[in-house]
């Protein structure tokens, strides 16, 4: 496994590197207008078809109603990059399931769905509730939950493709995809369809704001790195303190 692949396996590590200045420098492209509804989405991006089932459309509308424009575009790029990685790795996956998990993977960073749990859990809970309300099977709902909850952990990369490719796609959008899997021309097509809209700056601010309001939202992921750098008086809990205070003599 090369260094870039390892970074993509953990979005937490990936974002830490991104903050240090690592990132894909794509050539300038003329951006297409951002879609206002699912009906305005392109049919395909970089050879990847965007699912247009009723459930996929409903998931997109849920995300579009909660995300800021830059975060919605990130969610869409996550799906395309994840699907491209899956195709390059010859993995079989259910497109609709992966799409929904990718589109909703950052709900926990929105004012509508943020809370005191780690942001990835907040988002996973919201997505599962949405799916159950739409009559989706418990198995599929749990798969989406896992994809969202594990997208910031290397554990997710060892799960089935509908789960692992969420983190792969998100990681690719943070530090850039493996060129062997996603050539520069395809990256340009993705950025043209879904512009970054000052993603680095906006994402860091959003994460810092969420942790300011909900300190536990940082968990032990890249969110803690952001909190330690950008959130005043942030003092995360330490495992050693809990162990030392345990009710045992030794």
What annotation goes with each model-predicted range?
Residues 1-14:
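N-terminal secretory signal peptides and thylakoid transit peptides that target proteins
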Residues 63-69, 109-115, 211:
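A short glycine/serine-rich beta->alpha loop
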Residues 118-133:
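An active-site-proximal "capping" alpha-helix that borders the catalytic cofactor pocket
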Residues 96-113, 123, 147-152:
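His-Asp-centered metal-binding catalytic motifs of divalent-metal-dependent phosphohydrolases/nucleases
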Residues 1, 21-51:
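C-terminal segment of N-terminal export signals and the immediately downstream linker at the start
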Residues 74, 94-97, 135-147:
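Acidic/histidine metal-binding catalytic segments
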Residues 88-96, 112-119, 138:
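Alpha-helix boundary/capping segments in eukaryotic regulatory proteins
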Residues 11-12, 35-36, 41-43, 66-72, ...:
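Divalent metal-dependent phosphate-bond-processing catalytic cores, especially two-metal-ion Mg2+/Mn2+ enzymes
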């Amino acid at each position: 496994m090369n260094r870039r692949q390892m970074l993509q396996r953990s979005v937490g590590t990936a974002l830490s590197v991104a903050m240090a200045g690592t990132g894909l420098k794509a050539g300038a492209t003329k951006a297409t207008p951002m879609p206002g509804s699912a009906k305005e989405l392109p049919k395909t991006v970089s050879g990847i078809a965007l699912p247009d089932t009723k459930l996929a459309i409903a998931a997109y509308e849920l995300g579009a109603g909660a995300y800021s424009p830059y975060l919605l575009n990130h969610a869409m790029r996550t799906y395309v990059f994840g699907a491209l990685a899956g195709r390059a790795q010859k993995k079989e996956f259910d497109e609709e399931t992966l799409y929904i998990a990718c589109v909703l993977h950052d709900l926990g960073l929105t004012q509508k769905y943020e809370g005191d749990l780690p942001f990835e859990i907040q988002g996973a809970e919201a997505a599962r509730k949405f799916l159950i309300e739409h009559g989706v099977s418990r198995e599929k709902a749990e798969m989406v939950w896992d994809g969202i909850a594990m997208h910031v952990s290397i554990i997710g990369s060892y799960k089935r493709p509908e789960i692992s490719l969420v983190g792969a796609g998100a990681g690719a959008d943070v530090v850039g995809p493996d060129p062997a899997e996603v050539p520069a021309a395809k990256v340009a097509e993705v950025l043209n369809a879904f512009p970054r809209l000052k993603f680095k700056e906006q994402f860091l601010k959003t994460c810092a704001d969420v942790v300011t309001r909900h300190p536990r939202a940082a968990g032990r992921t890249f969110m803690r790195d952001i909190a330690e750098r950008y959130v005043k008086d942030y003092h995360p809990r330490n495992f050693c303190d809990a162990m030392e205070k345990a009710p045992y003599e030794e």
